[in-house]
């Protein structure tokens, strides 16, 4: 699982960055106390979420006495956004927003916030000065740092129809017509990650059907990228989500990884029943 902390100066672009991270599939939470970060990650893992982010701003630091300890224990990726004081001042004047530490003197509030966040800045894996960056430039900087090819991510989610398709799916592929290892006693306890299960699923007779699925997934992802989408989710479903869907999602990832940045999530592989 990827865990990211997004922080930095107010007016430096955290709202833009948060939206872009959500487009990349991150589940984002604002100012969650650090003592709740581990339970959040545990719940996210149980729900098949592969990317989680927490936004931290200066207002919350007074309530985050355990922040250093939790950062040391969980070691998230920390992204810090900043800008020159005169740029932040200009942005506030344009939007007529009140600074979160609002006390009537904007330059003093900016300096106070910078001091308050100095510890987090020192821990940052990426510091971005957005003074001369457009929103698009900020997104591109984040995409490069996070290893997202062109800012576009193809997500492949295996699932079982008996548990319901993923709500976030843009495209659902039905692989139930493929050979089912469930009916082979030797293969039933295994998963689609097992080489023997994969050989069973991808028999010679199954190959035309798989190639058609590959073509559809590739065309759909290409179209989404051309439209400027940040990510596209292809859900791959079999009956229980343990054998065929897992095997197909893995093979799709292997064959499409040369064209897209790909992430694979096996939502139901450990479910029983």
Curated annotation (Swiss-Prot):
Alphabetized InterPro entries for the sequence: P-loop_NTPase, RapZ-like, RapZ-like_N, RapZ_C
Coiled coil stretches, renumbered: none
One matching Pfam family: PapZ_C
Residue positions binding ATP: 8-15
Recorded GO MF terms: ATP binding; GTP binding
Keywords annotated in UniProt: ATP-binding, GTP-binding, Nucleotide-binding
Residues given in the record as GTP binding sites: 57-60
Family as reported in the entry's similarity comment: Belongs to the RapZ-like family.
Function (record text): Displays ATPase and GTPase activities.
Listed name of the protein: Nucleotide-binding protein TTHA0319
Source organism: Thermus thermophilus (strain ATCC 27634 / DSM 579 / HB8)
């Amino acid at each position: 699982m990827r865990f990211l902390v997004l922080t930095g100066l107010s007016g430096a672009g955290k709202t833009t960055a948060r939206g872009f991270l959500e487009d990349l599939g991150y589940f984002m939470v604002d100012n969650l106390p650090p003592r709740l970060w581990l339970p959040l990650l545990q719940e996210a893992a149980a729900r098949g979420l592969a990317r989680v982010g927490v936004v931290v701003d200066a207002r919350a630091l007074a309530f985050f006495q355990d922040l250093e300890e939790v950062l040391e224990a969980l070691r998230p990726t920390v992204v810090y956004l900043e800008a020159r004081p005169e740029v932040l001042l200009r942005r506030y004047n344009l939007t007529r927003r009140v600074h979160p530490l609002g006390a009537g003197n904007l330059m003093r509030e900016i300096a106070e916030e910078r001091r308050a966040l100095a510890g987090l800045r020192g821990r940052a894996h990426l510091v971005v000065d957005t003074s001369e960056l457009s929103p698009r430039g900020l997104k591109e900087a984040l995409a490069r740092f996070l290893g997202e090819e062109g800012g576009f991510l193809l997500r492949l989610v295996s699932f079982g129809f008996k548990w319901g398709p993923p709500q976030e799916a843009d495209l659902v592929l039905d692989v139930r017509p493929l050979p089912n290892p469930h009916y082979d006693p030797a293969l039933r306890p295994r998963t689609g990650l097992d080489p023997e299960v994969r050989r069973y699923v991808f028999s010679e007779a199954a190959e035309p059907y798989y190639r058609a699925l590959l073509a559809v997934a590739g065309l759909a992802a290409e179209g989404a990228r051309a439209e400027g989408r940040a990510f596209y989710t292809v859900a791959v479903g079999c009956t229980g989500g343990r054998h065929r869907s897992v095997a197909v999602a893995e093979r799709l990832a292997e064959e499409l990884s040369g064209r897209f940045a790909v992430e694979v999530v096996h939502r139901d592989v450990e479910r029983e029943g």
